[in-house]
Amino acid sequence: MIRVATAECFTHGFVAREIHAYSMGYPGGYSWSVDSDVVLVAGLFIPTLSGIRSILKFEPPEPSATLNDIKVYTEEEDERVALMMARSVRELTSADLGIGTTAGIGRGGIAVVSENREEVINSDVEADLRFSGAEEILMRQRSGIRCALELLESFLE
């Protein structure tokens, strides 16, 4: 049994929900290509700086901007923070795999980490949380969910 935990921002907990549904035998909208014994330990939606500090227990880098305590990083910063989130949630939950997602300006950052492997990727859609319309933000979110699950599958193979 592979234990997975997520700390999500721009994917709003949908990665965790999809993993849980798959593990229980009723996958949602994602077409899984692996057959793995997986369990979701925890799925956290953490869009704010205060949430990172109080729940994930690390001091995040200073963002480019904030919107009501919601962190807005550049794409490069998102990659770094997603990795920090994935490492932290994995450690705090004693999971085998940790997943972190965050997106402010650009394609966002998506990280999956295990004891001996770490990978960081981006969604396929650029947007800016400060200025993009809802459709662009939601397109980036859908892309991020798919990309995160595809990356997770590469760890499960």
From Swiss-Prot:
UniProt-listed Pfam families: HcgF
InterPro entries per UniProt: HcgF
Homology family: Belongs to the UPF0254 family.
NCBIfam families membership: PRK00962.1 (NF002122)
Name of the featured protein: UPF0254 protein MTH_1148
Higher taxonomy: Archaea, Methanobacteriati, Methanobacteriota, Methanomada group, Methanobacteria
